[in-house]
Every structure is written in C-alpha cells, then in structure tokens.
Amino acid sequence: MNTKTCSIQMTSGSLWKNILMFSLPLMLTQVLEVLFNLSDVAIAGKFADYIALGAVGSTTLLVSLFTGFLIGMGSGVNVRAAHRLGAGDDNGVRLTVHSSLLVCSIIGVLACLICLLLAEPMLNLLKTKSELLPSAVTYLRIYSLGMPAMAVYNFGSGVLSACGETRRPLVYLSIAGALNVALNLFFVICCGMAADGVAIASVISQYLSAALIVIHLCRRKDCCALSPSRKYISRRACADVLMLGIPARIQNAVFAVANLFVQTGVNHFDAITVSGNSASANADAIIFNVQAAIHTACASFISRNRGAGNHSRMMKSYFVSLTYSFAAGAILGGLLIIFGRRFLSLFANDTAVIEAGMERLSIMGWSYAIASFMDCTIAAARGIGKTIVPTIVVIMGSCVFRVVWVYTIFAHFQTITSLYLLYSFSWAITATAEMVYFFTVSRKDRFAEEKSALEKSA
C-alpha cells in the first residue's frame, strides 16, 4: 500500500505529536464552518431585511438535523477506512471508498427529497411565524439542493482523515467558504435577493467543495483513489458505514430534544435570565467543536491501530486523546470563567444579562472537562466498531436523565443553578458508564484479535 500520501503516521511515531497535528486542521475546519454559517445569517440580516434574517434563522434546527446525518456518515466512512488501512487491506479500502460514496450519495439525495417535499409541513410543525414562512420554505428547499454535495464532501473528508490527511479538507472548505461569502454579498447586495440568494450561494459553494475533493480522490494513485470505471461495491461495507454513522446522529437528535426540556426550564425565569443563558450558550459550540476534532482523531487512530493489530498503541491513542480533550475543556473553560464577562459583552450590552450569563458560565466552565470523558470514550468505542450500546447509554444518561432532572430536582429547588447543574451530573454519569463499557469491550476485542492471530499462525 502506498503510504506516501498519508501526511500523518497513525501506527508509528509519537502519538502526542501526531494526534495534535491531526487535530489542529480539524479544529480550524470546525471553526471555519461555524463562521461561514454565521455569514449567511449576518449578511441576510445586515444587507437584506428582518424577514430574510428570520427566514434563515427559523430553518436552523432542520438544517442542523439533516446536515448532522450527513456529517455522521462521514465519520462512519472514516472509521471503516482507517481500520482497513491499518490492516493493510488494499482491496478492503477500495471497497470501503466506493461503497461509502454510494451510501453517502443516496443519503444526501434522500435528505434533499425530504426537504423539498416536506419543507412547509416541517416548518409549520416548528410554529414558524406566518410572515416568515414563505421565505423560510424557499430557503430550505433551495438549500436542500446542496445536501447531496455536502454528503459527498463529508465522504471525501472521512476518507482523507482515515489517511491522516486533514489539511486538504481544510483548504477545500476555505476555498468554498470564501466563495460562499462572496456570492452571499453578490446575490444580496448586487442582485437584490434575500434568503433565496443566501441559499443559492450555499448550494454553489457546497458543490465546489464536493468537486474539489472528488477530483483529488480520482487523481490519487493509492488504494484510496476513486476509480469510476471499476465497480468496488460491497454490501458489508455499506452496512458498516451505516452502522457506524447513523447512531451518532440519532444521539445528537435526541440531545436536541432533551435540550428543549432544559430550555423549558430556563423559560420559567425572567427575560434577563433567558437572554443570559442564550448569550453564554455561544461558548458551547466553540469548545465542543475544538474537542470534537480531538475525538475524531481518537476514533481514527484507534481504528487504524486496531486494524494493524496494535492493541497497546490503540489504548494509548485513547489516553492521549482524552488528555488533550480534557486539557482543551479545562483551559478554555477556565478562560471563560476568568474572562466570561468580556466574552458575554460580545453578545449583550446589558449588565444584568451579562451577570445572568456568568451564572451559567461559572458552572459550564468546569463542566466542559467532564464532558471530555464522555465524548472521547464514545469516539473510542466507535473506533473499535461499537456504536449501538454507546448510543443507548448516552441517550439514557445524558438525555432521559436530563428530562427526569428537570421534573424532579429542578422542580423541587426552582433555581437556575439547580437547572444548570444537570449538565455536570449527566455528563459524569454517562462518562462513567461509557468508560466501563469501553474498557470491557476493548479487553474482549484484544483477546479476540490475539486468538485470531494464533489461529492464523497455527
């Protein structure tokens, strides 16, 4: 297998260095995605009108739900490709690459069709304001046309990440994102368009990023190359990608539902508290995206080393990733506690709102580090091909538990602190259960690998 294209060695060298170098481009990619998504909202609000701003904003939940599934498929591709690469199975890699492209493309087309056909009913279900509904429906339908391209880009990003190549997807996303901002300005300012112009810009940029990554894969000379003239399709590979990718997205969807109950609790308080909660919640996306990059590295390194039969390095990859994730959560959370008022002043001018936001940050600031144990362990379990049980555990521990907390602990104390503390407790409980499960199955996995190796050598 040609490994020259693999920019970061996963099965040899310093794990401390390689995991960090693998994660940094992913962190930048995550931050860029947040910034480019914000550009849609900012340009719609600044240069169009409040209807355009509201229309784009009212589709956020649905867009996040559907794009989340597409991103999840990319993570499934990443884990399976990394495992086959680690095992030195060139044909298995080819089957994974081509089967994954088929699966991701189908999922992307299905997501597009659902949004095209059900955009208005779904937005009505979310109680979208009548004055915003026509523009919101138009935006969602146009935006959905880019979902097949988004699925293909995430497929390609998953393949390249499995190779240890995380810089190239960052470059492609940067190019497409810059075009997105430029087209947003062109369609809205020069053409006088509103939400529809913003959606068209997004679709064009998504197809550009997909085209760039597909062209690169077609030009590769190794087993990760796309060969349109050959048929490398495997039902097993298709099933594996689905089993690895879908549970994580179901988990995120249930998280969103559980957080609606938390928001209901917040809404029991005055407008200042609600505004402070909203302002401080902006920190979540930043810190979780940084940690998510490390968790992707964790799954990739574990899967790659598992394929290579290197159990000790596999476990060390977990502990190194966990250390980085914990450090990121602790350091960034600590900075938020220290400089929280300055951070909140970016979103609010009212002193009372800032102080209300600090109530949340003072608890969440040290809770992000706790979350690292949960999320990193889930990623590690995914790296060894285990997704169903971790998903059930996180649904029970971090979702069902939150709903129960709201109707028991919070209902008893009726304080905002008692509500915010549910994050810390739910993450701690879930992390404990996930770690017990991971260490149990990883031990069994090691014994199974050793037995298989002995049988082959006999």
What are these regions (language model features)?
Residues 1-23, 81-148, 190-246, 302-367, ...:
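Short alpha-helical transmembrane segments in multi-pass integral membrane proteins
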Residues 10-47, 61-76, 80, 105-112, ...:
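N-terminal transmembrane alpha-helices
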Residues 21-40, 142, 153, 176, ...:
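Transmembrane helical elements of multi-pass membrane transporters/channels
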Residues 26, 30, 42, 79, ...:
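Transmembrane alpha-helix boundary and packing residues in multipass membrane permease domains
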Residues 35-54, 123-130, 186-193, 249, ...:
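Helix-terminus/linker motif at the lipid-water interface of multi-pass membrane proteins
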Residues 44-64, 131-135, 195-196, 237-244, ...:
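Interfacial/gating helices of multi-pass transporter permease domains
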Residues 53-113, 150-169, 263, 276-334, ...:
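Small-residue-rich hydrophobic transmembrane alpha-helices
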Residues 74, 143-161, 169-180, 198-213, ...:
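Short runs within selected transmembrane alpha-helices of multi-pass transporters and secretion channels
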